[in-house]
Design a protein with these regions (language model features):
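Extended non-catalytic accessory segments flanking core domains
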Residues: 1-173
Length: 173
């Protein structure tokens, strides 16, 4: 899956996949400007278990343009992206950043974080590279990070921030 973002706020991102039977491989790099066409859906039967009701673009075709750099993350709070927030779906596919967070719980699949709002949000490593995955495995309850950043998505029944690399994890304070 790929995350596509046009802007830096709510409703500016989407998750998409390239068709499995694509004849020409498409090579995209983070920060590339792309033109994508496809079908918007909230229910893709091929992805029900993993992505459930995630708004997705399917049967996508992609034209890669020039490198323009990564989008600016939407700075949000745990209150904005907790599981039952009023507009939580509006951040799907958007690069989000949360500042001054505390790891509040660790389990086998994800990490819960809180901030000054008192709400809890989830971090996940499904999109993480090996270095980020290793760093996340060292996080413990009570650790404080100056910021976390990642692509916001819905998978396996929960909304979460998908960490991509070590830079997304900020500094432990």
């Amino acid at each position: 899956s790929y995350a596509l973002q046009d802007g830096d706020g709510q409703w500016d991102g989407i998750i998409f996949d390239l068709p499995v039977d694509a004849t020409e491989p498409v090579i995209m790099t983070r920060g590339d400007e792309v033109t994508v066409t496809g079908l918007i859906t909230d229910n893709d039967p091929d992805w029900t278990f993993k992505f459930g009701g995630n708004t997705r673009l399917i049967n996508a075709s992609v034209e890669v343009g020039s490198a323009v750099g990564e989008p600016t993350p939407a700075v949000v709070s745990c209150e904005d992206v907790h599981q039952i927030a009023d507009e939580v779906e509006s951040y799907e596919g958007v690069l989000v950043q949360l500042n001054n967070v505390t790891v509040s719980a660790v389990n086998d699949y994800d990490w819960a974080i809180t901030d000054e709002t008192g709400f809890e949000a989830l971090l996940d490593d499904d999109m993480a590279n090996m270095a980020a995955d290793n760093m996340m495995s060292l996080l413990s309850e009570g650790d404080v990070l100056d910021q976390v950043m990642g692509v916001f998505n819905y998978s396996f029944g929960t909304y979460k921030i998908q960490i991509r690399d070590v830079a997304d994890l900020g500094t432990t304070m």
